[in-house]
Amino acid sequence: MMDMKVAKKKLGIKERYAHMTRGLGWEPTYQPADAVFPYDKYEGIKIHDWDKWVDPFRLTMDAYWKYQGEKDRKLYAVIEAFAQNNGHLNITDARYLSAIKLFWQGVSPLENYVVQGFARAGRHFRGEASRVACQMQAVDELRHYQTQAHSISNYNKYYNGFHSQRHMWDRVWYLSVPKSFGEDALTSGPFEFLIAISFSFEYVLTNLLFVPFMSGAAYNGDMSTVTFGFSAQSDESRHMTLGIEAIKFLLEQDPANVPIVQRWVDKWFWRGARLLSLVGMMMDYMLPKRVMSWKEAWEIYAEENGGALFRDLARYGIRPPKGWADACEAKEHISHQVWLLFYEYGGAAAFHTWSPTDDELDWLSTKYPNTFDKYYRPRIEFLREKHARGERVYQTTLPTLCTTCQIPLAFTEPGDPTKISHRETVYKDEKYVFCSDHCQEIFAHEPEKFVQSWLPVNQIYQGNCFNPGVDPTAPDFDPLKAVLEYFRFNLGRDNGEFDGSEDQRNFAAWRGQASKN
């Protein structure tokens, strides 16, 4: 009997998950728990039972590595094939590359901020399961940045504007919009970070970024971007599920958490909606072949899906964000307003802009029947006519930035698309400017945080955006040229009008060589 082998019982998913998460924790003995976890109480959130945190996927680290390894093998096979077969010549039009440049300059670095945020949040949560979830999401986001870098690096061999990403991220005026979003989240408490990224961005808004943009990449022949997008999308689906579980966990722990969470939902929904105005511009103006308009994407992914979400959360006492109605009204306007801003400041951006064709204007008229022909088409046609006469419009002045979202004041008043929205607050004898009531309210709640905002335009005026050795008092000093050199732009190659650009000429020549003798 002693020699009989006992069949080893195979653990179920639930038992295995418990061993690989809660089983990894321990109670500190030589330090009080409050000293080990000093940041999980000061935000006012009350947690009574960390064991209520459950990952709906019950994913353990060993299973995680197996899934991600399989996805990486497939992804890198496609990237290699794309590079070896000159896949960059299969895209519809070199104008499409400007959308990828903006994604690379402004979205990919944000992934690195989220890596840092989840690593920090995981360190400061007491529950073992929440720490494991944060660790996996931090690794996910790091992997997303790396796969984006490896996919997009192929374009950097042939086209302008893909270089110096890390340098530009810390300096270029329009990149301060995603950068300030990431730094605001990164410097918040661990629970606010969770609501900012896991819930407000990942659950409520992420589909507005990834689904239409990756569909647009497929429609425009960019299989490299499609593949890293789809590889990340399965992670995003998991992040979304964790996001809804995270907010429910906080709301179920204590009724006192509800007003705190509601304020964070108000803030981060609005900050995310403002940030995604860049995506709206990409969808409506920068994709030569368009899948859907920004307005249609907003109606599907924000109004329908988000509306159902907030109806579900009503039983916890959570209402739709304060800026919901204004953001829904803005779906008619923001993509046009942001495109016109970048068109006129195209000399100061590291990607190209252009005048839409007649077909593209007609498409916009169809998609925005209530607003485009009335408010935006006349202005675009006016600028196009000036360009045809050799008078391409470039703004050489600097715009006023919103202190909170850092977007130039280009958005209009709710209910009046003919009037620029402008708000002011005086705090400690200094005046601060905002693009909306909601950005002003965010500032009012955390003024000491936002008075420290590094606003690029203000820094330029203060003389802090010139390379060492530049003499602003020299007779031939050109301040705009000096600032663009500080940004490390290759002037005349990275920026300006698309028609006649080096990217346009090279793409046409290389594709001609690839398709005929």
Enumerate the predicted regions with their spans:
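Conserved alpha-helical segments that form or flank metal/cofactor-binding pockets of metalloenzymes
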Residues: Y30-A81, L142-Q165, I244-A246
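Cys/His-rich microdomains that often coordinate metals
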Residues: L409, C439, F443
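Long, hydrophobic, well-ordered secondary-structure blocks that form the structural core
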Residues: L102-P178
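Alpha-helical bundle segments that constitute or directly flank the non-heme di-iron/ferroxidase center
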Residues: P28, D93-F125, S188-Y219, A273, ...
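Acidic/His metal-coordination segments adjacent to aromatic residues that form catalytic metal sites
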Residues: F82-F103, S164-S200, A218-N220, W268-K289
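Inter-helical turn/loop segments and adjacent helix faces that build the functional surface
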Residues: R120-V132, N154-Y159, T187-G189, V211-S231, ...
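Extended, helix-rich structural scaffolds rather than catalytic motifs
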Residues: M1-H48, K52-W53, N257-E391
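Intrinsically disordered, low-complexity terminal tails and linkers in eukaryotic proteins, enriched
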Residues: D358-E430, E448-N517
